[in-house]
Curated annotation (Swiss-Prot):
It catalyses: a lipid A disaccharide + ATP = a lipid IVA + ADP + H(+). InterPro entries: LpxK, P-loop_NTPase. It comes from the Bacteria. GO terms for biological process: lipid A biosynthetic process; lipopolysaccharide core region biosynthetic process. ATP binds at residues 55-62. The gene is lpxK. The keyword Lipid metabolism applies. GO terms for molecular function: ATP binding; tetraacyldisaccharide 4'-kinase activity. This is Tetraacyldisaccharide 4'-kinase. Pathway: Glycolipid biosynthesis; lipid IV(A) biosynthesis; lipid IV(A) from (3R)-3-hydroxytetradecanoyl-[acyl-carrier-protein] and UDP-N-acetyl-alpha-D-glucosamine: step 6/6.
Length: 328
């Protein structure tokens, strides 16, 4: 229902317009206060790169963060990552992730990023505290990438990158809750890079698509082509589950059942195992896998995806960030 409201297919969005105007007024006032320096943002001693959205979730932001961190690491840059840690609840903040940190403590995305990149990752509702925690333990970090946080103006930033769903774009264009917008589309004019996931990019935008890898068994780590798996039940607890189901079909998999879950939904063995019957195979997103690995069954697999950026602009962006991190 919410997708139909936000896309404009349902007329119910008009009933929510008063709340949207209020949201836009408050969020705009907050940004203006920081722009006029009526409120002071904290500036880190190292460059900060924000990777965020203009819309609510499901745009492919986390794969972009992983891509960015890995690309900078390959260039010899020491990177730290900070996040709000949505869906997690730590005993105290800031929380610096370790091999023992769970998604219940830190949230799905931070654990996934930590496991994929090995970079120092810290979470806190106050992102400046997370930055300070990383720099206290890893003083050699040269640049901070913040996963989400475009609207978190309390943290000053040197580079802003926005990830856009190229198929859904901005829906009906309205602020939450009548539409999907955290900020209006005009905000794109003031950011440093716009990365478009799928669809047809517009002038000045960087094209991106998600490239699926081999399926990985949660229990054994064994890998195989996902098309080799039989009697598949697909599960996705991400911002836009249909994208994952479409990816499976693109890989030659016709799921017997597709199970969309809420983003950041907590999972347990009983609920997940109930999704599959004898002889069926469960295939989930990598984001779900970080929550299920501790209690996984032998017939549970996940499909990792990597961001693939096209054109000349990614190299220019990476050169800019490498120069920033190196102090040039």
């Amino acid at each position: 229902m919410i997708e139909k409201i936000w896309s404009g297919e349902s007329p119910l969005w008009r009933l929510l317009l008063p709340l949207s105007w209020l949201y836009g007024l408050v969020s705009g006032a907050i940004r203006l206060c920081y722009k006029l320096k009526l409120k002071r943002a904290w500036r880190a001693p190292v460059p900060v790169v924000v990777v965020g959205n203009l819309t609510a979730g499901g745009n492919g932001k986390t794969p972009v963060v992983v891509w960015l961190v890995e690309q900078l690491q390959q260039r010899g840059i020491r990177v730290g990552v900070v996040s709000r840690g949505y869906g997690g609840k730590a005993e105290s903040y800031p929380l610096l992730l370790s091999a023992d940190t769970t998604t219940a403590q830190a949230g799905d995305e931070p654990v996934l990023i930590y496991q994929r990149t090995g970079a120092p990752v810290a979470v806190s509702p106050v992102r400046s505290d997370a930055v300070k925690a990383i720099l206290a333990q890893h003083p050699d970090v040269q640049i901070i990438v913040t996963d989400d946080g475009l609207q978190h103006y309390r943290l000053a930033r040197d580079v802003e990158i926005v990830v856009v769903d190229g198929v859904r774009r901005f829906g009906n264009g309205w602020w939450l809750p009548a539409g999907p917008m955290r900020e209006r589309a005009g905000r794109l004019k003031s950011v440093d890079a716009v990365i478009v996931n799928g669809g047809v990019p517009r002038s000045g935008e960087i094209p991106m698509h998600l490239l699926p890898g081999q399926a990985v068994n949660l229990r054994t780590g064994m890998r195989c082509d996902v098309a080799q798996l039989e009697h598949v039940v697909a599960m996705a607890g991400i911002g836009h589950p249909p994208r994952f189901f479409a990816t499976l079909k693109m890989c030659g998999v016709q799921p017997e059942k597709c199970v969309p879950l809420a983003d950041h939904q907590s999972l347990n063995h009983a609920d997940v195992s109930a999704l599959v019957s004898a002889g069926q195979t469960l295939v989930m997103t990598e984001k779900d896998a970080v929550k299920c690995r501790a209690f996984a069954e032998e017939n549970w697999w996940y499909l990792p995806v990597d961001a693939q950026l096209s054109g000349d602009e990614p190299a220019k962006l990476l050169a800019q960030l490498t120069s920033l991190a190196s102090g040039n």
